[in-house]
């Protein structure tokens, strides 16, 4: 029976780039495994967690035995946030890729490789906006509402939610952080 390596993370895990990510090296060493990745450069830990839970749930609903699933999660920086917007908010935010890239469009944060807004369910509209500390898009949020402590608490909650889900479903997993972002736990 086919086995599944399901991974998620940020650019360090993303498999769309020119470099070979750790997950591609790992699946080469795991005979009989296929690789499923929803990693995306700059995405935060909320979308990483949700993407893993969605992908594992889909495999289980399709009859895959939990023992045939291995999950690898690379946690991103705790200052990376994601927000689910409705159609009106997306329109107000003017998040329109056709308007151009970072330098020519102050309302966006793309530099040519990032998908924003994005999503983790392939059949659903992409309404999750990812943001980072240095992006113009989220400048007000980070100045007024974000702190390193908040980022650490949110990251720990995403980690726990993911662990609890995987353990409840008897899924083998490994987790690691690519940044030393949990300074305040």
Task: Show which residues each predicted segment covers.
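Serine-esterase "nucleophile elbow" of acetyl-processing enzymes
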Residues: 1-55
